[in-house]
């Protein structure tokens, strides 16, 4: 039941909530080999209501140190008589040496004249889909920094596939079990106008997150120091550039939560070029990945494991679809929509490009291009509208993933200048997608499953990695936020708590009824059921009778008669 029927348009002023960190843990003992020690901490409260966010600060910290202990490193295992010993110490099959392929990542197996090339005299390139297969995925939406796989390894095979985009054959890395080319183009335009920021933001965040099991908690910016010598991101295409990334779109849309009289429409375009599947066994991971796994302490230390997860991802891609996509969010002026009596259908006809299903990346869009109605020039065109002082489109927020940077810049420039994208600009971008495809969708597999069981202490490392993934998601959770008013939902975006309001409310905490709702005083504003926010789960109890339990509480700070849906206690086998 609602708490009454008369809503208050103003609540007491909200106090900004600043980020609060826990105390640092004790330093670990000094590592006698690296001469480095580590410590870590946690976020206790995330910034909210205009307070200081927990942004850019790491969970873990490291420091140079001195140690009198002797550095004891395990000697590399000796290769067998039927194996070749790489300069790095890695072992490969003897038959793979002197075959023209760098089966040793350092190339030491090819200090000789090739005598038996797998593909004979033919030279086949590995395409971008093959080189970047297995992309890492971060459960909180961040782009990982390093690919865990060695996709320059072929295991002496010459498996190839015909690339229908250029009619050339490409050689498949050993890790890729299957690569199919099939070009599919589609365009979707939102069926209705988003009347508020919160509905759009909720939709964007839900699409971005790998799982919604623990609410809308997203982290786009890495904060932990990389384990790599150079920070090189691995995913293909323009999606890496912050200016074009979907994470930037969410950040820009979130800035409109405090701006009134704005509506939104979305246009999504996608060109899918291929699907791939990784092998189910005997995957070849990179030597650097193995070295980083070995460098992780057997005694769990949160900060070091978090660094690994931000480098490689919490999961890798077992199956994936590659290609390119663009997303446009039109920020519209509500007053202009009303003045011009514009309908959703009229706006849809104006802002869509008109991508046909008959798509060929060599020639562009097949068939007749979509012709916009005559009213569109005056309705959407930014230059015309601004001269008349009746701008409908305040801004177009653009995301481009896949394709070359030059083509993406041209697309963005066209949209920024005209407010619309023309077919030619779209075609020019689409032709470059095959050169730099992005991962469009994926089937994830936990990253710890890539740790070879033959590695010393493999089970301990796998369990530590599994624990780190669970703690990583729990660290960046909305359970560390204050509850919202009037049925608003919580979201966590890069260390800052946001309230996503129901359409009738606005404000940092959804504490204000919208002005339109109060114009007719005879129709009181309904107060929606207040939702409390669950605290974070307490630590697990000791094991008793093969079971353990943990508890949480309902945070109703500042709310009246609020409740939380769900269980206070959960149990697990032990």
Curated annotation (Swiss-Prot):
One of its GO terms (cellular component) is plasma membrane. Residues 115-480 form the MACPF domain. It is found in: Secreted; Target cell membrane. InterPro entries: LDL_receptor-like_sf, LDLR_class-A_CS, LDrepeatLR_classA_rpt, MAC_perforin, MACPF, MACPF_CS, TSP1_rpt, TSP1_rpt_sf. Residues 77-117 form the LDL-receptor class A domain. Pfam families: Ldl_recept_a, MACPF. Residues 481-511 form the EGF-like domain. Gene3D superfamilies: Laminin (2.10.25.10), Low-density Lipoprotein Receptor (4.10.400.10), Thrombospondin type-1 (TSP1) repeat (2.20.100.10). GO terms for biological process: cell killing; complement activation, alternative pathway; complement activation, classical pathway; killing of cells of another organism; protein homooligomerization. SMART domains: LDLa, MACPF, TSP1. Disulfide bonds join 19-54, 30-65, 33-71, 79-91, 86-104, 98-112, 119-158, 350-376, 481-497, 484-499, 501-510. The chain crosses the membrane at residues 212-219, 235-242, 344-351, 352-360. Keywords: Complement alternate pathway, Complement pathway, Cytolysis, Disulfide bond, EGF-like domain, Glycoprotein, Immunity, Innate immunity, Membrane, Membrane attack complex, Repeat, Secreted, Target cell membrane, Target membrane, Transmembrane, Transmembrane beta strand. Glycans are attached at residues 3, 231, 261, 533. Pore-forming component of the membrane attack complex (MAC), a multiprotein complex activated by the complement cascade, which inserts into a target cell membrane and forms a pore, leading to target cell membrane rupture and cell lysis. The MAC is initiated by proteolytic cleavage of C5 into complement C5b in response to the classical, alternative, lectin and GZMK complement pathways. The complement pathways consist in a cascade of proteins that leads to phagocytosis and breakdown of pathogens and signaling that strengthens the adaptive immune system. Homooligomer; about 20 C9 chains oligomerize to give rise to a huge beta-barrel that forms a 100 Angstrom diameter pore in target membranes. Component of the membrane attack complex (MAC), composed of complement C5b, C6, C7, C8A, C8B, C8G and multiple copies of the pore-forming subunit C9. Belongs to the complement C6/C7/C8/C9 family. This is Complement component C9. It comes from Oncorhynchus mykiss.
């Amino acid at each position: 039941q609602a708490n009454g029927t008369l809503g208050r348009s103003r609540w007491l002023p909200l106090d900004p909530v600043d980020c609060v960190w826990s105390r640092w843990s004790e330093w670990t003992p000094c590592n006698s080999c690296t001469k480095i020690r580590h410590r870590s901490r946690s976020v206790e409260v995330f910034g909210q209501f205009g307070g200081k966010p927990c942004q850019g600060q790491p969970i873990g910290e490291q420091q140079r140190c001195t140690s009198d202990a002797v550095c004891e490193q395990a000697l590399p295992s000796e290769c067998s008589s039927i194996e070749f010993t790489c300069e790095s110490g890695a072992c490969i099959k003897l038959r793979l040496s002197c075959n023209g392929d760098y089966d040793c990542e350092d190339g030491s197996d090819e200090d000789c004249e090739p005598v038996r090339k797998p593909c004979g005299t033919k030279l086949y390139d590995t395409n971008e889909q093959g080189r970047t297969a297995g992309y890492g995925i971060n459960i909180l939406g961040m782009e990982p920094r390093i690919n865990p796989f060695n996709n320059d390894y072929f295991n002496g095979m010459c498996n190839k596939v015909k690339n229908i985009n250029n009619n050339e054959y490409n050689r498949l890395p050993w890790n890729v079990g299957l690569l199919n080319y099939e070009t599919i183009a589609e365009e979707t335009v939102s069926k209705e106008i988003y009347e508020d920021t919160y509905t759009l933001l909720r939709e964007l965040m839900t699409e971005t997150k790998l799982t919604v099991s623990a609410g809308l908690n997203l982290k786009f910016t890495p904060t932990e120091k990389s384990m790599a010598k150079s920070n090189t991101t691995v995913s293909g295409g323009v999606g890496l550039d912050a200016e074009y990334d979907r994470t930037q779109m969410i950040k820009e849309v979130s800035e409109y939560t405090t701006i009134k009289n704005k509506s939104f429409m979305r246009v999504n375009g996608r060109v899918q070029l291929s699907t791939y599947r990784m092998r189910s066994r005997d995957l070849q991971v990179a030597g650097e990945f193995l070295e980083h796994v070995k460098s992780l302490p057997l005694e769990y230390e949160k900060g070091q494991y978090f660094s690994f997860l931000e480098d490689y991802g919490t999961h890798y891609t077992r199956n994936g679809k590659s290609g390119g996509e663009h997303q446009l969010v039109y920020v519209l002026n509500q007053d202009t929509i009303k003045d011009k009596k514009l309908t959703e259908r009229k706006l849809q006809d104006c802002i869509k490009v008109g991508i046909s299903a008959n798509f060929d990346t060599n020639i562009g869009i097949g068939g007749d291009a979509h012709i916009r109605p005559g009213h569109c020039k005056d309705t959407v065109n930014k230059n015309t509208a601004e001269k008349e002082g009746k701008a409908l489109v305040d801004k177009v927020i653009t995301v481009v993933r896949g394709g070359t940077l030059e083509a993406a810049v041209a697309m963005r420039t066209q949209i920024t200048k005209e407010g619309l994208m023309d077919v030619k600009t779209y075609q020019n971008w689409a032709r470059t997608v095959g050169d730099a495809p992005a991962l469009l969708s994926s089937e994830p597999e936990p990253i710890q499953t890539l740790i070879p069981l033959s590695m010393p202490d493999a089970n301990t490392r796998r369990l530590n990695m599994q624990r780190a993934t669970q703690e990583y998601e729990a660290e960046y959770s909305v359970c560390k936020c204050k509850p919202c008013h009037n049925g608003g939902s919580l979201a966590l975006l890069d260390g800052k708590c946001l309230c996503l309001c129901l359409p009738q409310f606005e404000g940092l905490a959804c504490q204000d009824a919208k002005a339109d709702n109060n114009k007719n005083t005879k129709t009181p504003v309904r107060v929606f059921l207040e939702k409390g926010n669950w605290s974070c789960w307490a630590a697990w109890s000791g094991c008793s009778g093969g079971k353990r339990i943990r508890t949480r509480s309902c945070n109703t700070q500042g709310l009246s008669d609020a409740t939380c849906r769900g269980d206070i206690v959960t149990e697990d086998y032990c």
